[in-house]
């Protein structure tokens, strides 16, 4: 296919036009007085949101050159979202500022490759300074502040802090849509997995249709159980003790299942059977997790164990087991606490080593089930449009809170970036030429988030930036009350990881765009598409 090529200034200006179209759409959402953007959807109601990456993902421009520029900045937002889960609007805004200032200097004759070196040096210094000023997130109040600032809603911040308090920092917190109008928090204690009972006849509570056992034995195996003879020896030992039994196996079918149900109906012996969670290697790992949690031994050919020779010592126990048609929950397993701790540390190491996002997510779920539990935030709203917007805000706030717990927090509202400017300015003494110009580009870009927050509040950004720069560290501008305050004391904080990632990703992509000297796109074909074939029916007479 034939290509069209643009060079030098013409190419860079076309790319910049695309960058500006995307960034101008996203940046109106920044700050406590930022607005929303409405996005048309082919199916369902339009989406109203202030989430930077959601807006960026929807933007495709007609002009191919402009679209390339937009896609590059979209990558800044997406990468920041992947790493930190929030800060996508800040990242987009920083990228726009670096590209704007950089292209001015390239047009004036600066060498882009040397500019890039200066930009990188300045970013490294700024990031180091951010880490030095970062404060540890300790206590429920600090966690609530990060969530509240990200979602612009104190209630959401409090909800996330409650969830983290109940399931721990490693716990899984999921966000789901509620059928009611209110937003609530449900906490599942212990280990839960998505496998329910194999027969409804096994329930102990017919009203709730669930089986609840206190202090039962737990039999774990990766085999199929087809006949009751396979497990008869161990069943006889359990019946003698008058205890109940939870069986977790690859499957239980035919005569084995029928016999267990029959004994339950006759009142001889109470048992509930479920399939093992997961598939393949993940199933083996999850069975091992349950074994460690409950103090059981997985009866498996690989380990040299057979069901027929299984003994009571191989079974695990737990304070309570609850099984409904979809889920099994094990609360307070009787496993050895040091073995559980070792297993948790092993999973943490696997999380650090894996490169797959899917594997990381599954490992984090396993970690949560072993170490804390699962909290579910049920999001409610009056309309579907409000529900979608609220759910996105809560997801962002949750990501921001996790990032804060991980790397600490800095003053929010763009103040932390303004306060690292003196450290960046110190570089001007040790650099020269175009490298020095690169440092100046970052120095100017660091003001941009605060300028935009002020502009979105209908105020003059330059005056506010000047005032914050001349104030001591930690002082910033609260756009909601329009006062200068100590940002951390006022609870206006950003996670260090979010601010750092936004700056690093913006500088990385922007510096690459500045070094562009040619741009190539496909030439659009003006040929009309092929006409449709003749319709069916009788030919004309």
Swiss-Prot record:
Protein name: Chaperonin GroEL
GO molecular function: ATP binding; ATP-dependent protein folding chaperone; isomerase activity; unfolded protein binding
Protein localization: Cytoplasm
Listed Pfam families: Cpn60_TCP1 (PF00118)
PANTHER family reported for this sequence: 60 KDA HEAT SHOCK PROTEIN, MITOCHONDRIAL
Gene: groEL
Family indicated by similarity: Belongs to the chaperonin (HSP60) family.
Superkingdom of source: Bacteria
Main location: cytoplasm
Gene Ontology CC: cytoplasm
């Amino acid at each position: 296919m034939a290509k069209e090529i643009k060079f030098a200034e013409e190419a860079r200006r076309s790319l910049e036009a695309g960058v500006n179209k995307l960034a101008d759409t996203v940046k109106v959402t920044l700050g406590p007085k930022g607005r929303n953007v409405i996005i048309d959807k082919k199916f369902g109601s339009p989406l109203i949101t202030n989430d930077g990456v959601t807006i960026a993902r929807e933007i495709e421009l007609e002009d191919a050159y402009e679209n390339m520029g937009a896609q590059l900045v979209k990558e800044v937002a997406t990468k920041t979202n992947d790493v930190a889960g929030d800060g996508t609007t800040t990242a987009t805004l920083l990228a726009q500022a670096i590209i704007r200032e950089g292209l001015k200097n390239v047009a004036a004759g600066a060498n882009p490759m040397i500019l890039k070196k200066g930009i990188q040096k300045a970013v490294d210094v700024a990031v180091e300074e951010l880490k030095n000023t970062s404060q540890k997130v300790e206590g429920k109040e600090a966690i609530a502040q990060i969530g509240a600032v990200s979602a612009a809603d104190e209630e959401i911040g409090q909800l996330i802090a409650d969830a983290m308090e109940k399931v721990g920092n490693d716990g899984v917190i999921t966000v789901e849509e509620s059928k009611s109008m209110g937003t609530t928090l449900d906490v599942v204690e212990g280990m839960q997995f998505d496998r329910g009972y194999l027969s409804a006849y096994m329930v102990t509570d017919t009203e709730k249709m669930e089986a609840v056992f206190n202090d039962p034995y737990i039999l774990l195996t990766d085999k199929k159980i087809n006949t009751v003879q396979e497990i008869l020896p161990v069943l006889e030992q359990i019946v003698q003790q008058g205890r109940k039994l939870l069986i977790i196996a690859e499957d239980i079918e035919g005569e084995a299942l029928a016999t267990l149900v029959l004994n339950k109906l006759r009142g001889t012996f109470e048992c509930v059977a479920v399939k093992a969670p997961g598939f393949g290697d993940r199933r083996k790992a999850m069975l091992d997790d349950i074994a460690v949690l409950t103090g059981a031994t997985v009866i498996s050919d690989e380990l040299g164990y057979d069901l027929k020779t299984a003994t009571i010592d191989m079974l695990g126990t737990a304070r309570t087991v609850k099984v409904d048609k979809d889920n099994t929950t094990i609360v307070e397993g009787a496993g050895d606490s040091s073995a559980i701790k070792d297993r948790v540390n092993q999973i943490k190491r696997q999380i650090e080593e894996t490169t797959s996002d899917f594997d990381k997510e599954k490992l984090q779920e396993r970690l949560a089930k072993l170490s804390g539990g699962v909290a579910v935030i049920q999001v409610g709203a009056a309309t579907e449009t409000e529900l979608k917007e609220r759910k996105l805000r809560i997801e962002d706030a949750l990501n921001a809170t996790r990032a804060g717990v991980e790397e600490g927090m800095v003053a929010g509202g763009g103040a932390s970036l303004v306060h690292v400017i003196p450290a960046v300015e110190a570089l001007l003494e040790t650099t020269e030429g175009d490298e020095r110009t690169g440092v100046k580009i970052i120095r100017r870009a660091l003001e941009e988030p605060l300028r935009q927050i002020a502009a979105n509040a209908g105020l003059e950004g330059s005056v506010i930036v000047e005032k914050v720069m001349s104030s001591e560290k930690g002082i910033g501008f609260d756009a909601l009350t329009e006062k200068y305050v100590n940002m951390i004391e006022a609870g206006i904080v950003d996670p260090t990881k979010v601010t750092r990632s936004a700056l690093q990703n913006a500088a990385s992509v922007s510096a690459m765009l500045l070094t562009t000297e040619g741009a190539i796109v496909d030439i659009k074909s003006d040929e009309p598409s092929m006409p449709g074939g003749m319709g069916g029916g009788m030919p004309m007479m």
